[in-house]
Amino acid sequence: MSQSVLIVDALGAGKGWRTRSRDVIGAGPRTVASLLESDYEVSLITYEDLQKLGLDSVMDYDTVGVSIMTGDERAARRMFDHTRSRTFRFIGGPGAADPNALLKTGADAAVIGEAEETLPELLEERGPVRGVYFRRGTEVDFPGPRPISRRFTRVNPEYIRAYAHRWAARVYVEIVRGCSNSCRTTFELPDGRKCSGCGNCREGEGGERWECPEGIPPGCGFCSVPSIFGPTRSRPLNEVVREVRGLVREGIRRVVLSASDVLDYGRGDLLTDPRTPPPNVEALRRLLRRTSKHVDVLFVENVKACLLNREIAELLGEYCRGTSVSVGVETGDPRLLRAIGKPSTLKEALRAIRLLRRAGLRPHAYFVYGLPGQTMKSAKLTAKAMKRAVEMGAEKITVYRFRPIPASAFGDFPPGPSPRNDEASRLIADTARRLNEALKRRMIGKRIRVYVAEPDLRRPRDAIGWPVKGGPKVRLKGARELVGTECEVEITGVVSDKVVSGKVVRILEEIDVEALEGRGVPG
């Protein structure tokens, strides 16, 4: 009899349940479950559902793997504390790149980045292998990195059944792995590493751009994707379409084509230049045409501003009209942009927002406060850039506090100062809040389609609507009984810079959620 493996999606569950992006289902845990299903009895569950069953349920499995982000270590620890002594325990996901996560969670091993080659070997050996941090008591072994893989797992769409609100969620489907940004930060790192100005990462050719004589990780300093997943490579189109079709058969209505930059799709193999060659228009057209014909609503995740032009914007608008799309601006200070390793300029980012808006999409502009090198001058420039982004058509300004991510160039920097304690961070955060509240007020009186997805966690008699084409969550007073429907709602007010209130105008569709819930998860 084959051994049993439980994969737990604990992404964002540090407090015991997800409080943000509850309408998002990532690709990672489903990919890992699919990778192992031919050799093991695999089950997939979310951390929230596992708590409802009882954490003691993990005792039934020979191996337990948990997908985490930084901040989810406590959730993993609580699970692992309920396993038997002979159970093999591992972590994966973005949080696994920190060797300290092994000690915080009590896991035996942490899979860094891609699982295709690493995880099967790890479960066979149950010992140190390349691409894994392995714990021995309070010591951590690292046999070394594993070369990047060109292999993509064939994802079993049936694993989406592990997610209770899948019918209303935005389900991510991987189309590109890695990142093409070879640029590096020019800031001196805490351990003394500093750019020597050799020019390889910005002016070199091919693989030369990926090599840094000073050992500085590639990519934007705050991001670990290039250093963990390597240069960009595209997933075969037939595999993408196969997964999308399978998800639709499972009741999925919204799909997000997931990539560090959708415009890298089909642009080349093992791409190390974020600017050239230009996007492969025909490859993108085939991707969008063949996926959009199967699903109700198609999103693209991210676009690099330096690759976007009017032709590409109009192509995205043709197949994804009315949906939200992310543009990373990060800061309004041109000097800081280059210093953190960003390949796009501020001018390019603002132009991309304008082009996307004109093409019928709803761009969201992303900024970071507390970055290394932040000054009051850079904060003022960032506040100005936020206002310009709104003028160019940004529907939302998203701001994040800089937090060091393991395996990124800035991984050893301290977290950025909070708005409470720092005037520059406060200026950026307050500007974003005011702009977002003003943008939400523009919505009052408008009618949109939402999926009434779940009761309000704070007001159980109310319900939360997830806008069909993306946007702020809609609080619907007294609408708990409408959970499981698609409705047209009128926006009536602004609750916060992230939530609006609304009233139901009419029910468009009653969805047979019970039939979907009755389908068993593979395993």
Swiss-Prot record:
GO terms for molecular function: 4 iron, 4 sulfur cluster binding; catalytic activity; metal ion binding. Residues 193-447 form the Radical SAM core domain. [4Fe-4S] cluster binds at residues 212, 220, 223. PROSITE patterns: RADICAL_SAM (PS51918). It comes from the Archaea. Keywords: 4Fe-4S, Iron, Iron-sulfur, Metal-binding, S-adenosyl-L-methionine. InterPro entries: Elp3/MiaA/NifB-like_rSAM, rSAM, rSAM_horseshoe, Tetrapyrrole_Bchl_Biosynth_MTs. PANTHER family: ANAEROBIC MAGNESIUM-PROTOPORPHYRIN IX MONOMETHYL ESTER CYCLASE-RELATED, METHYLTHIOTRANSFERASE MJ0865-RELATED. This is Uncharacterized protein MK0932. The lineage of its organism: Archaea, Methanobacteriati, Methanobacteriota, Methanomada group, Methanopyri.
